[in-house]
Amino acid sequence: MESIIDAHCHPTDAPQELHLVANLSVGKLIVMGTRPTDQKYVEQLAKEYPGKVIPSFGIHPWFSYYLYDDLDKDLQSSETRKKKHYEKILTPIPDEDFINALPNPVPISEFLEDARRHLKQYPNALIGEIGLDKPFRLPVGPYDARSSLPQGPLSPFYVKMEHQCKVFEAQVRLAAEFQRAVSVHCVQTYALLYSSLAKFWDGRWIPSKTKIRKMKKEEYENSLAEERKHYPPKICLHSYSGSIEQISQFSAHKVPTEFYYSFSIGINSRYKNFIQTLKGVPDDKLLAESDHHSASQIDELVRQSLNVMSEAKSWTFEDTITKISSNSKAFLKVT
């Protein structure tokens, strides 16, 4: 599977297995950042295995509460900031003991500046894992700086969607600025995800197919050059769990960003409509992923994902390898 790219994985969560990365059968891994404390681990892995690891930097919606809006006048005082921040973004409002156990929040601007530095240093880097997650509830500690998996039982407290959107859109804006691909997590809120993303291209010049046919290639490229600065070029909806109808919405001609859809066995096999959804994805927009935290499991999980794609699309396994490899290269602009 040398030509296959694992479109979404988290091997930095299992540092004891990172030595296995070099000998994986998959050709490359897109390794996700999820929270302020793990961006450095993603960077370290990319430095150690530059030919194998494509880094992706971002704040997952599960960790969006780590960031506070430093433009909010109510959060200027360091003495009251933590309490006010969590009271603003969590619902219902937690008690003081719960808030005290939470990490001290980081300014959004500080994270974005750090991500900007990473993007400059790694021209192939993505933004991710970012997104929106409606049913997510905060865990009841302890808070493990190394793991992206919830530790302990879940609390009754949710991160308000308003705050999730603020953190998400700030990162999409950064992806647009640097023209980088994005890996997106979305659970039970695809309509809100679409409306959040549509802000970036609404009102922009998007020529009709007839207009495109009449334009010379150079004229078309020049006309779009300025418009492209306002939205990311490509977005992967990872472990996609939306409907086939929503695929049509994201992939409509009026949407200038190219949408890809990746699938993992661990997540997508839970859904009874998994095979039907796979059938509904355009053949050239399908990607494979493990979405796993252990390097030792990545090859097998990617292989299982490819097997299910073969079944759903009625492709041979060899044809599936060829098609998914081509799609991965197109997503990353790899030639």
UniProtKB/Swiss-Prot annotation:
The lineage of its organism: Eukaryota, Fungi, Dikarya, Ascomycota, Taphrinomycotina. This is Cut9-interacting protein scn1. Belongs to the metallo-dependent hydrolases superfamily. Interacts with cut9. Pfam families: TatD_DNase. GO terms for cellular component: cytosol; nucleus. Gene3D superfamilies: Metal-dependent hydrolases (3.20.20.140). One of its GO terms (molecular function) is hydrolase activity, acting on ester bonds. The gene is scn1. It comes from Schizosaccharomyces pombe (strain 972 / ATCC 24843) (Fission yeast).
